[in-house]
Structures are given as C-alpha cells and as structure tokens.
Design a protein with these regions (language model features):
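Nucleic-acid substrate recognition interfaces
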Residues: 1-328
Length: 328
C-alpha cells in the first residue's frame, strides 16, 4: 500500500551530488567519418574537462535525424549518454473506430507477446525464454554475492550492496531493455508489412501488486517490465503511423473468442460461465472442439474489447486458429 500513497514533496538536491547535464544542438553536433556517426562537442566544453572530444555511436543510422539535445545522465557508477532527435511521425489516415485491419497483443511470461491479426496473417508468438534466462541468471548471481556479504550480520548492520552487485544489476537492465527493443521492433515491422491500422495491447493497472502465483512465479512475473514494452510499442507504432490502444484485459484467456463468450471486467467478482476451456498449458478448446493457442485466444479477446461490433468474418479469419508462428 505504501507504493500507492501520495508522494512527498522532493527534498533539496544534494549540492555535491550528480545531476543530469543537458547540451542543446547549439553546443554539440552530429558528425560522420569513416568509423561512423559520433557526437562532437565544442572546444570550450572539452577544456572544462566535462566530456571527451567525441562519443562514437556505433551502427546508428542518423541520416534522417535532426539533433535536438544530448543528455549526460548519472546512472550508478556510470554516465549514460542520451541523444534526443526529432523525427517526422506519419499521421494515421483513419480513426480508431474506422479501422478494419487490427492486431491484438496479449503480454505474458512464457510467451512475451502473442499477436492475433484480423488481416488473415498467421498469429505470431514472441517467446519469453531469453528474458527469463537473463533474470534467472541475475537472481542466482545476486543471491550468491548477497550470501557472502550478509552471512553472520544483522539486517541493520553493514552494507547490503557492493559495486559488483550494482554492475550486475546494470548489465541485467541493459540486456532486458535490449530484448524489449528488439521484440517491439519486430512487432511494428510485422504490423507495417500487414498494413495494420490499429494495435490493441492488453494491460491491467496494478497487476504486479496483486499477483499471487507462488514465490518463484511471482518473481519471474514482476521482474519483466511489461509497461516498458507497452511504451516501446506505442512510440514505435505512432512513428509508423499506427494507432496504439491500451485496454484493460481482465481474465480474457478464459473466454472463448471463437464462441464470443462475454469477457469479464478486471476486479469484478461476478461469476461467468465460459463455453470453452483450457485443456492443457498453451492450448484452448472451443465449444465446437476447435483447438486454438491459449495466448492467441487471449489476444483475440483483447481485440473484442475494443471492437465488439466488428463483423465476425473480419475478426476471425482461418488464420486465427492456425498454428502460430514463433519468432525471436
């Protein structure tokens, strides 16, 4: 409950602490040589000893980008360089309610995302194995070093985190963010290829605080930053001219999308009767015996949340019940 309380007024900043340093495009420039793109700072800044003369940007393609500002952000024992560029966003040509080509995304753990399309494309699963492996290895490392650090000490005595543990945490965070960037980019590329007009993503506010799946499963679920993934899908979709709608998803995986069962509302204690059921992990059977991937069934129900009046023949093509394509 303390995490949902009204936040306190911030204290004064530490005069000896680290703060973000922001350079406008009047101070620093983007340049390119045979080694690729890099950030160039003026001599006055270099003489002050704040930064190096250049920061290489690797394989970033910045031909169409207009630099707005460069930020140096304190991040633990390191400094993070952020480049803010202005890009042109494609304006959607239709409204949300006019769309007929829609993609529904169900976010989970074993399958990071399950994507159903109304365009006839086979549904797609993006597996969550990689991000689970990263978190499991991270937990194992942190538990090992914490046991060495805290053995024989009371909770109020001594330090609780070393520099090595901080580096391990920062590396884990970078790897998870990289996985989410690649997954969200794959989703948007698929939607652009299929001419998708609207993406509907399921999300429940506060679901991590109220989850009860056992200690081990809770840890796996809570350690995946689902909200970060949703925000990545939103801004990348908007840049591609695709509208992104985030809706409450409730326990939509229990309702049969093929039989058009009523979808429950999250937090509502009303008892519902469903015509189909999940017969094993990852497999759902409808009233008429049609088998469908359970997560794809959930993704299809997410579309129904926003488009309940869409004609059934447009909403459920044969592609919905096909074996989904697995990628990443």
């Amino acid at each position: 409950d303390k995490y949902e309380a009204i936040p306190h007024i911030p204290r004064y900043a530490d005069k000896d602490g680290y703060k973000p340093l922001i350079f406008t495009n009047q101070i620093c420039k983007l340049r390119k040589d045979k080694h690729g793109w890099y950030v160039k700072f003026p001599k006055a800044v270099l003489q002050a000893g704040w930064v190096r003369d250049r920061y290489d940007l690797g394989k970033m393609d910045l031909h169409e980008q207009k630099l707005k500002e460069v930020r140096l952000i304190p991040n633990g024992d390191t400094i993070k360089l952020e480049i803010v560029c202005e890009i042109e966003i494609m304006e959607p040509t239709i409204t949300i309610h006019e769309a007929t080509r829609v993609a529904g995304i169900d976010i989970g753990v074993d399958n990071l995302t399950a994507i159903a399309f109304t365009s006839g494309h086979r549904p797609v699963l993006i597996k969550g194995n990689e991000i689970k492996a990263v978190n499991q290895f991270y937990n194992k490392q942190i538990a090992h070093y914490r046991s060495l650090l805290r053995t024989g000490k009371k909770d109020s005595k001594g330090i609780h985190q070393t520099k090595r543990m901080k580096r391990i945490s920062e590396k884990r965070n970078r790897r998870v963010k990289d996985i989410l960037h690649k997954a969200s980019r794959k989703i948007i590329d698929l939607c652009v290829e299929e001419g998708i007009e609207v993406i509907v993503v399921g999300n429940n506010a506060g679901w991590k605080k109220r989850i009860h799946m056992g200690k081990k499963n809770n840890q796996t679920f809570v350690q995946i930053p689902f909200r970060t993934l949703i925000e990545m899908i939103k801004y990348k979709g908007e840049a591609a001219g695709i509208r992104v709608v985030v809706c409450e998803e409730a326990i939509q995986s229990k309702a049969s999308s093929i039989d058009e069962d009523q979808i429950p509302v999250y937090g509502n204690d009303v008892t519902h009767t469903f015509t189909g059921k999940r017969i094993k992990r990852g497999l759902y059977r409808s009233k008429n015996g049609i088998l469908i991937n359970a997560d794809i069934n959930g993704a299809s129900n997410i579309i129904r949340k926003v488009y309940p009046c869409m004609p059934k023949r447009e909403r459920w093509s044969r592609g919905t019940v096909n074996v989904p394509v697995t990628c990443i």
